[in-house]
Amino acid sequence: MKKRIPKIIGVVGFSLIILVVGIFAYLYFNHAIIISEGKEFKNQGSPIIKSQLSKDEVKEDIDYIIDIMENTHPIFLEDVPESYYIAKNELLTASNQGVTVGELQYKVSRYLSSINDGHTALWWEENMFLDIDWKYLDGNLYLLDSNKKLTDKVVTKIGDIEIGKIIESIRAHFPAENYVAEAKNIERFLKGKLVLENVGVDCAKDILVTLSNGEEDKILEVEFISGSEYRSVNNGIYSKVIDKNIAYIRLGTCEINSTLKSVIENIEKYKSEGIKDYIIDVIDNPGGDSNACSMLLEALNMKGGAYGGMLRFSPLAQDQRGYLRKSGHIEYKSNNNAVKNNDINLYILTNENTFSSAQMLAVWVSDGNLGKIVGRPSSNMPSNYGDVLKFQMKNSKLIGQISHKKFIRPDIGKDKEQILEPDIYVEYGDDILERAIDYINK
């Protein structure tokens, strides 16, 4: 018996080792094991657009961005579009000569845009914009009046260049996941001096914009102004009761903080008071932490389905996220096991600027039939790439971001849809909140 004890201990010990190794292997190949907090991205300096780069500096930056792209983005584990290889060859050709930082920015932007991922792009450096407001609808660029309302005047030329030529250049150089994103790009980048110069507009003099109402042309003289082209938006988080019986929740950004927790406390109060109609407003919400959206649904005694997808490990992801692995990938399965609260009527307000995690909230509600979407569709596809990592090119100092995850919506039968269409569509210029209130009170 005594002779058998060491043998038994050995067998048990070996079995435990096999078990531990098996558990570790399972976790290693099926879960994102995080072993550190990851390093915070540090800006190594600002790009100087007019600065000249040597041939060697250009080549080094181009080699770097191609390496980052192909070793980080999940699309390279799937079917890569032919447009990517065309753009890559064009970029490699550009590495044979010196260019300015601005010229390199344009070429790299075209390269990154070839996969049409709205999360993967350069942080576009531009500080001069036409002092004009317009809206791209149904294939036309309409002038807006001082109150941001549509006019009947359509932009047909900027300088001597036909508007169609400029739009084609924007389509080629900036990522768009759907027609909404394309319209946003046109509205934004058509104002930029660098973009206009690239297509041949003479920006050394006052810019003449040709307008047409279908009967006659009119010339409008427009100046460039410096500063951001972005309008200010309300990114607050708060709640209130409107019309005595509707709980309005403004989620201006997807962030878990004290104000969100106060809103959740208010929701409990609203429920105890018998309020049945709830509006969550994510208009112009750029995204953030999707858990903030989950917390709001949970407070309403609801639960969305689960996004599936893929996480790709890479040196960049390991550095910034603290993953154990720096290569390979793991996959997750979607499910649409949503939980609806039939005692509550839920309405999600969205527009073209509802993005990333905020768009996920709308998809959860739509796929799980938890409520109604009111407004206009997002520039973000319901299934998309995301969870961005930052990068900076050594010589040009250009900064950008790249997705390292793919997200597949809960209802996989709708995976290929490019747009999440609202249940109640609200035309541009009409108030989305007012439309939702009218629908509730009808």
Q: Which residue ranges define each predicted feature?
A:
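Flexible, low-complexity junctional segments that flank or bridge functional domains
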Residues: 2-278, 284-286, 302, 306, ...
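C-terminal "post-core" interaction segments
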Residues: 30-45, 49-63, 237-442
